[in-house]
Amino acid sequence: MPLKHYLLLLVGCQAWALGLAYYGCPSECTCSRASQVECTGARIVAMPTPLPWNAMSLQVVNTHITELPENLFLNISALIALKMEKNELSTIMPGAFRNLGSLRYLSLANNKLRMLPIRVFQDVNNLESLLLSNNQLVQIQPAQFSQFSNLRELQLHGNNLESIPEEAFDHLVGLTKLNLGRNSFTHLSPRLFQHLGNLQVLRLHENRLSDIPMGTFDALGNLQELALQENQIGTLSPGLFHNNRNLQRLYLSNNHISQLPPGIFMQLPQLNKLTLFGNSLRELSPGVFGPMPNLRELWLYNNHITSLADNTFSHLNQLQVLILSHNQLTYISPGAFNGLTNLRELSLHTNALQDLDSNVFRSLANLQNISLQSNRLRQLPGSIFANVNGLTTIQLQNNNLENLPLGIFDHLVNLCELRLYDNPWRCDSDILPLHNWLLLNRARLGTDTLPVCSSPANVRGQSLVIININFPGPSVQGPETPEVPSYPDTPSYPDTTSVSSTTEITSAVDDYTDLTTIEATDDRNTWGMTEAQSGLAIAAIVIGIIALACSLAACICCCCCKKRSQAVLMQMKAPNEC
């Protein structure tokens, strides 16, 4: 073979080897044509090599890598995103990220990092997102993030940080999202956030904060979300949020707040969600929640509130969800809900209410769902739902109700779900109107549990819906008459027991004739019935068909309303708190 052929073969082999070095994919990884490399698996204990020189995205997940040595990524300078999560990583050497000047996204979350070298990020000045969450970090150096003028997102939640130097964020002027939740902070410096004028999301949840100094959030004029839930905050300074006029979501739940200072929420015109559940609030002063014209959700459950005064929520005319369950409410003033003209859902369950004023819900013209279960309600005014024509769900189970007023639900044409079980219903003559209404509207009771009679003793435990309620009329002595088949009373909402009994007795006496006369005239139809009996049978059949049609219509209404209700609730209800 000529010498030039040997030379060509040698050059070709070298080029092939060089191509592998630049374009090859490590056996432990998968590489796509879109310059994406993914390396996963417990068998990986060191960074796989060689990595393709044109890689733009590298993911190293669920490996046993413990260390990133110096100059590890020198040959992949085009890298834009590096994700190293859920590894055993505990050490990063200075210079590990050298030559990654194009990197925009770096995630080191869910590792075992305890300390970070002071200049570990000096070669990635163009980072926009840095995720260090769910490690074991105990300290942040004052100049740790000093070179990140382009950083937009910093995630430090889920570490063991007890404090942060007050100058740690001074150079992060472009930061829009900062998560410091689930650490062990006990205090914050008033100047910690003073250079973060572009910050939109600040999360400090699940720490040990007991007090927040006045002025801590004054520089955060663009803040939209502030998460302070699950701390140990006992008091709030009156002007704590006065400079946060763009705030939309404020989470204060599960703290130790016992009172709300007057004017605490006065300067929050954009707020649409406020959570205060799981605190120690005992009273709500009228006007404390206003004006907040954009507030849609107010969560106040699991407090110690005992009463609601007139106009407590009068400045919240766009409120759609009000949750007051699991308190100690014994009294609600008739004007407590004034101004809540757009309220859709009202939760008052698990309180100590015994009575409600007939006008208490009169201003809630758009209410759709109301939960009153697990109180001590003994009775309800007949007009309590008079102005709430759009109700689709009413929960009254687990109270002390023995009866309900005539016609209390008649105008609620959209009612789909009514819960009445676990009440001590008294099934005497007074219950017949409710019994008849339930017969015609059984589909609205659902299929889980039906209301059951508690008294008298002879009907205890029987369903209020299907029980056969018979009340004897006055006895009339007369000659023995032929036995006439009995038919169920016609289900009708008005109580007509006395009328029907008298009519039946009078008819039986007036129409009495000798049996021989009946047999002689043979005035019976094909089924062996008299004309009167045939009329009763036909009437019973017609009424049965009408009742079946009403039940079917109620079922269709219920299905349609449930879909509408779920759609509304899906639009109102927000994700879980961060």
From Swiss-Prot:
- Recorded name of the encoding gene: Lrrc15
Looking at the record's lineage, which domain of life comes first?
Answer: Eukaryota
Where in the sequence does glycosylation occur per the annotation? N75, N369
Extracellular compartment spans: 22-535
UniProt domain LRRCT: residue ranges = 423-473
Q: Which UniProt keywords apply?
A: Cell membrane, Glycoprotein, Leucine-rich repeat, Membrane, Repeat, Signal, Transmembrane, Transmembrane helix
- What is this protein called in UniProt? Leucine-rich repeat-containing protein 15
Q: Name one GO cellular component term.
A: apical plasma membrane
Show the InterPro entries listed in the entry. Answer: Cys-rich_flank_reg_C, Leu-rich_rpt, Leu-rich_rpt_4, Leu-rich_rpt_typical-subtyp, LRR_dom_sf
